[in-house]
Curated annotation (Swiss-Prot):
UreD, UreF and UreG form a complex that acts as a GTP-hydrolysis-dependent molecular chaperone, activating the urease apoprotein by helping to assemble the nickel containing metallocenter of UreC. The UreE protein probably delivers the nickel. One of its GO terms (molecular function) is nickel cation binding. It comes from the Bacteria. This is Urease accessory protein UreD. InterPro entries: UreD (IPR002669). HAMAP family: UreD (MF_01384). The lineage of its organism: Bacteria, Bacillati, Bacillota, Bacilli, Lactobacillales.
């Protein structure tokens, strides 16, 4: 039986004569994809758009991205993901499936999730990639939104991200937040901050020297957020950030992405031309 989604997007990218093109662009339901854009390097990028402004209780969404051999693309969200309250206790869900072929390169730069009062949300992402492929993947979650501007008024938030290389699970990260059962301000949770973001970079070009150089680069910036970088067992790293605002955290994420783009691929910094959203 075919799964029915409230919103579905399928993007496919191929390399044609040294230039990446979009060979597939499908959208249905509440999900839309922006018109074609290209950065200063000619890399195509697209915004994922939700026509309803946010996810309603019980809705299910699917994003599928395929990047073929030698292709390079960037996909981002137009705004943060707003998850509205779930009065009936139904779970709102989004699945993301990404496939990266030989020597492909995807930058998936999702804005953070903003869970509303009483919301319940599960986000699952699976990335299948060739060992020669390059990946930048970011997401995050905030303290949420309520009419009284009280933090952590949502019921349930779960985010599971898994990366496979040659069908072997090489990275698995899960965030589970249940503010009614957990003290969100204690050590190991938000620790007094309101925004959490993570960035995963996987590339055969990432080694211990690159990780140390990136750490030094970030330490040289005037940053408002706390962050930590860890090397992965494979050629890659994970960056975790806690900050006062999403804008502060995003500055670190884009600094890392720009450093990778310049040092590894000789590309100019990102300029996605979208309004920054504070929460």
């Amino acid at each position: 039986m075919t799964q029915v989604y409230d919103g579905f997007v399928h993007l496919g990218f191929s390399n044609r004569n040294g230039r990446t093109i979009s060979h597939k662009k499908y959208q249905e339901g509440n999900s839309r994809v922006s018109a074609d854009n290209s950065d200063a390097n000619g890399v195509p990028y697209y915004f994922l758009i939700n026509m309803g402004g946010g996810f309603v209780e019980g809705e299910q969404y699917q994003v599928t991205i395929d990047v073929n051999k030698d292709a390079h693309a960037l996909v981002t969200t137009q705004t943060p993901t707003y998850v509205y309250k779930c009065e009936k206790g139904q779970l709102t869900q989004q699945n993301t499936s990404i496939t990266l072929e030989e020597n492909s390169y995807l930058e998936y730069m999702a804005d953070e999730v903003i869970p509303y009062l009483k919301s319940r949300y599960f986000q699952k992402s699976r990335i299948d990639m060739d060992k020669s492929a390059h990946l930048i993947y970011s997401d995050g979650v905030t303290a949420g939104w309520s009419h009284e501007d009280l933090p952590f008024q949502y019921h349930y938030f779960r985010n599971l991200t898994q990366i496979y290389q040659d069908n072997e699970l090489v990275y698995s990260d899960q965030t589970l937040l249940e503010p009614e059962k957990q003290d969100m301000f204690k050590l190991g949770y938000f620790e007094g901050w309101r925004n959490y973001n993570s960035l995963v970079m996987v590339s055969p070009n990432i080694d211990e020297a690159f990780v140390k150089a990136l750490q030094k680069h970030l330490e040289g910036l005037n940053l408002e957020s706390d962050f930590a970088i860890s090397s992965l067992d494979i050629s890659g790293l994970v960056l975790r950030i806690l900050g006062k605002t999403a804008e502060d955290n995003r500055r670190i994420i884009y600094s890392c992405a720009d450093y990778f783009r310049q040092e590894i691929h000789g590309l100019t910094p990102l300029n996605l031309r979208k309004n920054d959203m504070r929460r």
